[in-house]
Amino acid sequence: MKIYHCEDSLEGIFTAIYNTYEDHCIIRDTMVTTIEENLLFSESVEVIPDPEKTIKVIRTLKRRFGEADYETLCLALASPKPEKAQAVYRTIAKGLAEKCTAGHLMDAIADTYVNQTFSLARAAGNEYHHLKGFARFEELENTILYSKIAPKNNILTFLMVHFADRFPMEDFLLFDAGRYLFGVHPAGRPWYTLQGKDAWERVQSETEKLSTAELHYRELFRSFCHTIAIKERENRELQRNMLSLRFQEYMVEFQ
């Protein structure tokens, strides 16, 4: 068994997958992992992320499987679960070996690895769609729009694409509290990401300073939500099924 150890990122995993083909590995005897995985008599290979190799893999995936299946693979890699790297590697290998056409990579759902990839992508995709509606932006004193989230899956980049399209002329900041990951969108310019606890400590105090208009409108919004509620029809259990408590923590109407 040959084990490729890579960092937990799209670039790291795609570089590892590129290396498996470059080294002419036997697929069934090869493992790609983001965690410390040592098996008896196995050969361990440390993978350094390579942007050029990553771009080549992305280009191949889009050409062979299409944009939709490529997005599915990326959503699967956004999962926090450690089995994602091997699942995506074996799914890609199966698709290439069987000359799978665009839009049909996930058809072989009975295959263990394809099924894993599909399940991981579905979970990440569901959370992404939830946060498109549940993320709440608030205006800071410096007029920047700010939203704090804590998703299980690493989907901030997907959300940045969505909100950059919705608010192209707004300065906004999207913060993943669980990963200390920032999505920064300057008005009228491309967005980018920053990561680190130090960055959060530098801006934390600024995110607590809301504009006068924001304070006024959030109070109006809370009042509206409480006014339209019908006490006799309250059903907390059903509400939690439709809107998980972990989303409510950062929604102004529940604060």
Residue ranges and their predicted role:
Residues 12-23, 90-94, 161-165, 219-226:
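Short, hydrophobic/amphipathic alpha-helical patches that form generic packing surfaces
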